[in-house]
Amino acid sequence: MSTIILGIESSCDDTSAAVIKDGYLLSNVVASQAVHEAYGGVVPELASRAHQQNIVPVVHEALKRAGITKEELSAVAFTRGPGLMGSLLVGVSFAKGFARSLGIPMIDVNHLTGHVLAHFIKAEGEDNVQPEFPFLCLLVSGGNSQIILVKAYNDMEILGQTIDDAAGEAIDKCSKVMGLGYPGGPIIDKLARQGNPKAFSFSKPHIPGLDYSFSGLKTSFLYSLRDWMKDDPDFIEHHKTDLAASLEATVVDILMDKLRKAAKQYKIKEVAVAGGVSANNGLRNAFREHAGKYGWKIFIPKFSYTTDNAAMIAITGYFKYMDKDFCPMEAPAYSRVTLAVSYTHLTLPTSDL
């Protein structure tokens, strides 16, 4: 009998559903929310309302594209955290009702684990080379910047992480200071391709170990702009592409410096990148350069698997299903939770759902 998993993702502002059958992706549907662009960032209440409107048609479309009826499902996997509580509750509540009505198990998935295991998403006829354990994964997004030692599907260790702002968060905030649109990351990426990455210099953190810090870079960028604009009020407009390229290059240098140290310290040559910022052209180029210079075997996900999506939730759910790792129907959502931590003993804020 086939194992068919429905994955549901609703941690932030993308409503997504996907179907995995025996480890192969059959469908992945994502509904994004343009409503937040006018506010320059995600508005939690608006995101939650949009999820409520989108969740049913998105799941229906995912099943339709997969050619699967709901009665054929083996389990429902859902993002339990981290994320925006109002958004998470929509996905968690739907998953509970859907699974209960079908009499099938529920599988809770850590959103961050899903990003890491996105490297194992594969579709029929798709040439997808997957990393072998153990490997290093740089997980970098708007909310997280971590270096992870991936020992197995269900065994991961955080070697280093940001002690303040995440890389994507710093880029978005600097983009906002420049008066660019939302989300800032893709806009900075596009502008950077036309600019000189060595045009401007911004401060880099000097902290021990493998942890990251991006708050200093954000402050350096802000103060530098303030000083330059005293002499030229239109400085940003005159140097937009060079500013973007220099900012991007600084972020990438910070990320790759600690990743190089981790690869050397743990003697690992298989290195992956995951998360929304992994779509950044500068970061991808840096990975390719390091592959040639240090003999790394690198793994860069498809663009469609870098941002939030249910395919990564479904594949993680599939691996957990094979281990019979289910969760109770009363499982709550968690807005804040770290990677590779058992939900059982958490005392973080929860919902009653």
Residue ranges and their predicted role:
Residues 190-271, 280-294, 321-324:
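A contiguous, well-structured pocket-lining segment that forms one wall/lid of small-molecule binding clefts
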Residues 109-135, 316:
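Conserved phosphate-binding catalytic cores of ATP/NTP-utilizing and phosphoryl-transfer enzymes
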Residues 113, 150-194, 223-226:
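Glycine-rich phosphate-binding loop plus the immediately following alpha-helix
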Residues 115-117, 301-339:
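Glycine-rich phosphate-binding/hydrolytic loop that grips phosphoryl groups
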Residues 15-20, 137, 145-149:
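Short beta-strand scaffold segments in enzyme catalytic cores
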Residues 3-82:
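N-terminal beta-alpha supersecondary unit
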Residues 108-109, 288-312:
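Conserved phosphate-binding/catalytic loops in two-lobed NTP-binding clefts
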Residues 344-350:
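Conserved small/polar residues in nucleotide/adenosyl-binding loops
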